[in-house]
Design a protein with these regions (language model features):
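Intein/HINT protein-splicing elements and their conserved insertion hotspots or analogous self-processing inserts
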Residues: 1-91, 104-175
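Short, surface-exposed beta-edge/turn micro-motifs
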Residues: 94-96
Length: 175
């Protein structure tokens, strides 16, 4: 429910900036309702997959969700957001969760009944592709080949893991 702010984000850090405006929780009651509603949806087995939007923003969340399997991709429609600056939409670290619903109608009615704002972003595919459609002054589509970025992601994670754990444990997780 907050504007897409890049202050304090990983993206801002890559630009050697800190920023002055950061995302925040504007409505604590809504946050609490969302948390409790998601717990209910989990108990009712209505969530197939989920990931918080945190460090790295929405793009990192989408990539990490797709990295879970080699035949897992998504078609995402970013035009559902009022914000037209695609960089802000993808890299702002606003509080949020991306979830894959078991049954869209049950999921959506549960969120609506609990007054939880949400966006339907797209669909899961069985491809090696994350397709992002945006409207940043004119419609455009970007296709990301997931296998390329998955390899980079896991290699980087492995190198970091080596510094944080015993070498053989990092190697076992990587292989």
């Amino acid at each position: 429910q907050d504007a897409f702010q890049l202050g304090g984000s990983s993206f801002a850090q890559t630009q050697n900036k800190i920023g002055t405006e950061v995302p925040t929780i504007k409505d604590a009651d809504c946050f609490k309702r969302a948390f409790n509603t998601i717990q209910t949806l989990i108990l009712d087995n209505q969530i197939l997959a989920g990931h918080d939007i945190g460090s790295g923003g929405l793009i990192t969340t989408l990539l990490e969700m797709c990295f879970a399997d080699v035949d897992l991709g998504a078609n995402i429609d970013l035009t559902v957001f009022e914000e037209k600056d695609v960089v802000k939409v993808l890299f702002a670290e606003n509080i949020g969760i991306v979830m894959q619903a078991k049954d869209d109608s049950v999921f959506e009615s549960t969120l609506n009944n609990n007054n939880i704002p949400f966006y339907k972003l797209g669909t899961v595919t069985t491809t090696d592709n994350l397709q992002l459609t945006a409207d940043n002054s004119q419609p455009s589509t970007v296709n990301i080949q997931l296998s390329t970025y998955r390899d980079i992601w896991f290699e980087t994670s492995y190198l970091l893991d080596q510094k944080q754990t015993q070498h053989h444990q990092a190697t076992a997780r990587f292989e």
